[in-house]
Amino acid sequence: MSSQYLRIFQQPRSAILLILGFASGLPLALTSGTLQAWMTVENIDLKTIGFFSLVGQAYVFKFLWSPLMDRYTPPFFGRRRGWLLATQILLLVAIAAMGFLEPGTQLRWMAALAVVIAFCSASQDIVFDAWKTDVLPAEERGAGAAISVLGYRLGMLVSGGLALWLADKWLGWQGMYWLMAALLIPCIIATLLAPEPTDTIPVPKTLEQAVVAPLRDFFGRNNAWLILLLIVLYKLGDAFAMSLTTTFLIRGVGFDAGEVGVVNKTLGLLATIVGALYGGILMQRLSLFRALLIFGILQGASNAGYWLLSITDKHLYSMGAAVFFENLCGGMGTSAFVALLMTLCNKSFSATQFALLSALSAVGRVYVGPVAGWFVEAHGWSTFYLFSVAAAVPGLILLLVCRQTLEYTRVNDNFISRTAYPAGYAFAMWTLAAGVSLLAVWLLLLTMDALDLTHFSFLPALLEVGVLVALSGVVLGGLLDYLALRKTHLT
């Protein structure tokens, strides 16, 4: 058994998996934590830094164009490698261009480039996930996933901790971004050497097959809206704690960028890897629900470490302990959360549904930034991190509400169709669609504003209305799900 498990590690495509995983993880920090550190050092105000987290909306909305990348094939290197190559070349150019800018004087251009990087990175993730699924046989997907996750974490480590250290000690911020762009060259070579899948699912022939059928299947379940809320809320406390961690450690506590890079980025990512692996081991002994509950409690409680940092004297070991424990528990929660997403996918529509669910899981990480910046300025760091502990509670309560259907799906490997409240669900769906449309318009206008093509003063209000309308639709659907579940008796 062990030799069969290790066989994939001896094959040439394991190196390609590792390098492409690295390419997938590299851009994320360059538009989030590392960029946040650069703006902090350049004395950009806290609200602007928090607002910059919105550039990651591509990770939230990637499900909108994921069917198109499945439907259409580029004229070079095939359906999977063609899209991989295109996104990687665009990433290289955009990241290199970021190195020519200064946050203090060219903030709008920097925002526009960050949006482009996030869009190309999210698109690369879509295709890489599909390529892995197509290339790896079923018995090798576990080991293949481990290799790609290792590459992903290494990419985050390089663009996070190592990048901060290089920027602080050797290259400066602009030179560091040029180096990060150059690191994509081996990834492009790996894409050229990668095999194009030969035994793939047939390409969708119609828009209905590519887009509508997977969504109809998911929203036809009796717990679909509660699941949407659970996915958004389960890691909300973790998202709050992590949204301004770099700024907190540099500006709030007083550590320099090099110390934060070594401890928060490097030690933190290593702790996340250990937590994910240990969580996977524990999940062999626990049911999915129990793992989600225990790990969710731990990841919420671990945010108290940052609260202690905010009320005690500055000490490097205290920062190390808080960062390690929070990321360890966060990694355990992530392992259970990924298992939840896999359980929720119908195998007939796994690509589009996984893109939808994983995109929703990024909602907290993207949208808490502006709220977090406002909260800290209004109430201070200590109150903010206490609030991040409390923010984990709604997700745990919702998990308890969903327990019955989660256990049913895990045991029976199928889903229960919805039969009650059809008119109410239709209204909830239209409300959600209206909110998402408003957010899409807001993102388009924000990009035009960043390029100095237009200037709209109503953009903050449009964002608030879009979020409020979308959340209203999800909350209404969740309430209808709760009422329907009370009528359902599962065996």
Curated annotation (Swiss-Prot):
A single GO CC term for this protein reads: plasma membrane
Anything known on activity regulation? Uptake is inhibited by carbonyl cyanide m-chlorophenylhydrazone (CCCP).
Q: What is the effect of changing G268D?
A: In non-inducible mutant SN0301-3
One biological process term in Gene Ontology: cell wall organization
Say if the entry is tagged with keyword Zinc. no
Q: Which domain of life is it from?
A: Bacteria
Q: Does the keyword Transmembrane helix apply?
A: yes
Report keywords, A-Z.
Cell inner membrane, Cell membrane, Cell wall biogenesis/degradation, Membrane, Symport, Transmembrane, Transmembrane helix, Transport
> Periplasmic side of the membrane: what ranges?
33-47, 106, 241-264, 304-327, 454-457
Q: Which InterPro entries match?
A: AmpG_permease/AT-1, MFS, MFS_dom, MFS_trans_sf
MF terms in GO: peptidoglycan transmembrane transporter activity; symporter activity
Topology Cytoplasmic: residue spans: 1-11, 62-81, 125-221, 285-287, 347-421, 486-491
Q: Where in the cell is it found?
A: Cell inner membrane
Tell me one Pfam family matched here.
Answer: MFS_1
What the record says about its domains?
Four hydrophobic segments are not embedded in the cytoplasmic membrane and form two large cytoplasmic loops.
Main role? Permease involved in cell wall peptidoglycan recycling. Transports, from the periplasm into the cytoplasm, the disaccharide N-acetylglucosaminyl-beta-1,4-anhydro-N-acetylmuramic acid (GlcNAc-anhMurNAc) and GlcNAc-anhMurNAc-peptides. Transport is dependent on the proton motive force. AmpG is also involved in beta-lactamase induction.
What name is this protein filed under?
A: Anhydromuropeptide permease
Q: What is the phylogenetic placement of the source species in the record?
A: Bacteria, Pseudomonadati, Pseudomonadota, Gammaproteobacteria, Enterobacterales
